[in-house]
A protein has these predicted regions:
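Bacterial N-terminal signal peptides that target proteins for export
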Residues: 1-8
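Small-residue-enriched, tightly packed secondary-structure blocks
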Residues: 21-236
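Bacterial N-terminal signal peptides
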Residues: 9-16
Length: 236
């Protein structure tokens, strides 16, 4: 009887550790799913010639992809969605695309009544200041960094004052309809917990994006490869 009681007590002591490990595994699975979904979104968008202008892709320092943001989040506020940011490596963000860092889009109501069950967002970061502002802290779009609804069409002109001044250009896709959309009033920040789960406890968004020792997990390679194929080097 004492032996049975000891086994039972031991099981009770180990249960919290087993639960914590199970929760951590599940969270890591969620992060990998986010990366895979982001790769799928980018693949589908770049396969359609009339979506993002090629010259904008060629000039972008970073690309933020937020797959399947639920409409309900816009009604109740709080967390809009979670995704990833991929940046070009090297000095002045001119090298090949690097490892993806995890990011979250948050904020109160910003008038985004998209009218769909889920919406994908893509944000192009167009200059060094915009990219560097996102590496370390939360950024309010339209406040800390200028943002504009991006133009559509591979041959669309991106040289107007509005697009040239904007640090970020934002797009949405709902029910297959792709369009520029303003995200002013929301915030974009590094998802530190997710980055730790994917890359280790010392990993930060800034280190993942700027240090060559960080390599993309397998789940993020399709996203990085698709961007590299579409725009292998940044143009001035």
């Amino acid at each position: 009887m004492n032996r049975i009681a000891a086994i039972f007590a031991g099981a009770l002591m180990l249960a919290p550790f087993s639960f914590a490990r199970s929760a951590a595994d599940e969270n890591a699975k969620d992060e990998n799913n986010r990366l895979q979904n982001a790769g799928t979104v980018m693949q589908e968008i770049l396969d359609i010639p009339d979506d993002i202008p090629q010259d904008l892709l060629d000039k972008a320092r970073c690309v933020v992809v937020l797959p399947s943001v639920l409409k309900a989040a816009f009604v109740v506020g709080g967390s809009y969605g979670r995704g990833t940011m991929v940046c070009r490596t090297g000095k002045d963000f001119r090298g090949p695309w690097g490892a993806p860092a995890m990011y979250a889009l948050e904020g109160g109501s910003v008038g985004l009544q998209i009218g769909a069950e889920a919406t994908d967002f893509v944000i192009l970061v167009m200059n060094n200041r915009g990219a560097e502002s996102l590496l370390h802290s939360k950024v309010k779009l339209g406040g800390d960094a200028s943002v504009a609804a991006g133009p559509k069409g591979r041959t669309a002109s991106a040289d107007t004052d509005a697009y040239m001044r904007a640090e970020m250009l934002s797009y949405s896709r709902a029910r297959g309809v792709f369009a520029g959309v303003s995200l002013e009033g929301s915030t974009l920040r590094p998802d530190n917990d997710a980055n730790h789960r994917l890359y280790g406890p010392d990993a930060t968004a800034a280190l993942i994006i700027t240090e060559p020792k960080y390599e993309s997990p397998e789940s993020g390679r399709a996203l990085v490869h698709r961007l590299q194929k579409a725009t292998p080097e940044r143009k001035m």
